Amino acid sequence: MKRKLSSITILEQKFPQKMSNHQKASKTRRQRGYQWEDTIVKRFKKTENWKAFRLGSPSISLPDVLAVNTEESTIFTIEAKSGTGTSLPVPADQIERCLDWIKTFDIYKKKQVLLAFKFLSKKRIDVGVYRKRELREFFKIWDEKLEITDCVCTYDGKIYSKKDGIKKELFLNECKMPFKTKQRTSA
């Protein structure tokens, strides 16, 4: 009589380590960012003649979103920021990498870097404490003539540069998007 041999593998069960409040908050912020990028991509894809892609993880020096319209010879590199605070910062290196990307695509006549901001409908006022507010979105066109600096967008849609601790208002144009948004042209 033949016997069937089988092997048994014994694995040690790993119990997930409890996450600290800081780790939970970081994970939530990252998820909000990915969701906002994904929303932008889906909106472009539903629009005629547009194609859009999320380009990768934060560890890779790529813009968050690349959107192209070959019919209109247009390309956007988009840096997306989302949050519950009253301001959303954009580091200078992220603006610079978006500019580097659009400069490589000579075939497109219209090449723009967009800073896409989404202020969620809940405002964080303390750890785990939120207050309802209006959801707002802003799509600002980076002016290539400006010096590249860290900048911040406020809930009312104003953009400020931050250099050596000095805050200076930047007057960036709002981009009229080819899809429906929660954009506000004035607060």
What residue spans do the PLM features occupy?
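Short, solvent-exposed loop/turn segments that connect beta-strands within catalytic domains
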Residues: T70-T74, I107-K110, K123-I125
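Short, charged, amphipathic alpha-helix that recurs within catalytic cores of restriction-modification
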Residues: T86-L115
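Short acidic/glycine-enriched loop/turn segments that link adjacent beta-strands
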Residues: S59-L62
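Domain-level recognition of nuclease-like catalytic cores that cleave nucleotide substrates
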Residues: S6, K27-R32, Q112-A187
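Acidic-basic catalytic patches of nuclease active cores, encompassing PD-(D/E)XK
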Residues: K2-G56
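Conserved catalytic cores of phosphodiester-cleaving nucleases, focusing on short active-site segments
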Residues: F44, V65-A67, T74-T84
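Acidic-residue sensor for enzyme active/binding pockets
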Residues: E37, E79, Q94
